[in-house]
């Protein structure tokens, strides 16, 4: 019933987009650039964006996204997912996704092979076939609840192994893991870890939250991300990853200094400033100079208080903020 309710919500949004998308296309690049500016102001140095590919406006959004990212190429790194929002099979978008890959998208996307595409096997096989054809990574949005969701994850794991695509597949949301028994969640986590499938979560409020501590313990790479950022799907997104780390820590009761500090690695691609022995492990000479300076005494304070971001540096260049001489002397 939960998956049925969710799918009805999605189909309602799809119907809305049939009217909205053509009207918004003329301003797509401008809105994309505004979004990039927001993300940079919030400290982003690397972005993975899911770009709608659909039969309503074809590759119009992708064209606008590519143009916007070209404008910002010296300020942030980026990768684009060719995302068939209305269903790869449901909207007959297979050829569009292939065309998107040829145009410059980097990853093959998909959404809910069961409730949206209504054919788990065909949907997953098609996604993986496109990925292999274009030698591209995969990022699938999987909202399906409970055992339906975990069944889909296990099938994806098998296909990942068959294709030799270990380490190249991401499941966004993976909500099914939040509605199964601990035993089932452990088994799925172990299977995902075995084929190096990673998970991205928005740590949603009001839904069954996936067991991120369990996934982390089992060796599944977990990262945090934003879903909607003030669009017709939801008005609550901010684009602030530090806020996501804060929510993660609060949700799972990570309130001591060490746990709070470790929450930061879920938004830094796994980078930590200190190891378990308290030794500094980042930054080191030779590391890429892409980072954020924030007004905090330590990583734990930054997560707990969501401290002000003062400076964003990308590949050695300041892209947001100004560092004056007094502040520079205090850093040395």
Segments and roles (model prediction):
Residues 1-28, 152-170, 188, 238-255:
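Active-site gating loops and adjacent loop-to-helix segments of metal-dependent hydrolytic enzymes
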Residues 1-50, 56-71, 96-102, 129:
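Alpha-helical scaffold segments that flank or form the walls of functional sites
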Residues 37, 98, 129, 189-190, ...:
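Alpha-helical segments flanking ligand/cofactor-binding loops in enzyme cores
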Residues 43, 108, 141, 171, ...:
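Divalent metal-coordination and catalytic microenvironments
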Residues 79-91, 102-210, 221, 230:
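Active-site core of metal-dependent hydrolases
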Residues 159-169, 213-296:
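His/Asp/Glu-enriched, well-ordered alpha-helical/loop segment
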Residues 283-332:
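C-terminal cap of metal-dependent C-N hydrolases
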């Amino acid at each position: 019933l939960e998956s049925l309710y969710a799918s009805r919500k999605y189909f309602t949004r799809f119907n809305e987009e049939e009217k909205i998308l053509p009207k918004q296309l003329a301003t797509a690049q401008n809105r994309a650039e505004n979004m990039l500016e927001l993300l940079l102001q919030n400290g982003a140095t690397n972005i993975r964006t899911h770009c709608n590919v659909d039969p309503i406006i074809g590759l119009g959004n992708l064209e606008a996204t590519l143009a916007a990212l070209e404008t910002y190429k010296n300020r942030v790194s980026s990768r684009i997912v060719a995302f068939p929002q209305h269903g790869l099979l449901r909207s007959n978008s297979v050829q569009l996704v292939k065309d998107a890959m040829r145009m410059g998208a980097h990853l093959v996307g998909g959404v809910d092979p069961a409730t949206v595409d209504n054919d788990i096997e065909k949907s997953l096989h098609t996604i993986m076939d496109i990925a292999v054809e274009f030698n591209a990574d995969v990022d699938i949005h999987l909202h399906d609840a409970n055992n339906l969701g975990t069944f889909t994850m296990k099938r994806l794991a098998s296909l990942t192994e068959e294709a030799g695509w270990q380490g190249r597949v991401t499941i966004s949301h993976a909500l099914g893991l939040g509605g199964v028994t601990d035993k089932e969640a452990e088994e799925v986590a172990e299977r995902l870890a075995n084929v190096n499938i990673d998970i991205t979560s928005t740590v949603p409020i009001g839904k069954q939250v996936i067991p991120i501590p369990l996934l982390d313990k089992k060796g599944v790479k977990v990262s945090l991300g934003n879903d909607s950022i003030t669009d017709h799907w939801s008005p609550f997104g901010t684009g602030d990853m530090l806020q996501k780390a804060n929510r993660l820590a609060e949700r799972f009761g990570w309130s001591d200094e060490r746990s709070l500090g470790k929450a930061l690695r879920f938004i830094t691609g796994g980078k930590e400033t200190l190891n378990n022995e308290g030794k500094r492990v980042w930054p080191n000479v030779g590391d890429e100079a892409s980072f954020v300076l924030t007004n905090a005494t330590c990583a734990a304070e930054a997560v707990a208080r969501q401290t002000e971001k003062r400076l964003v540096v990308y590949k050695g260049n300041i892209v947001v903020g100004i560092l004056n001489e007094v502040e520079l002397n205090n850093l040395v």
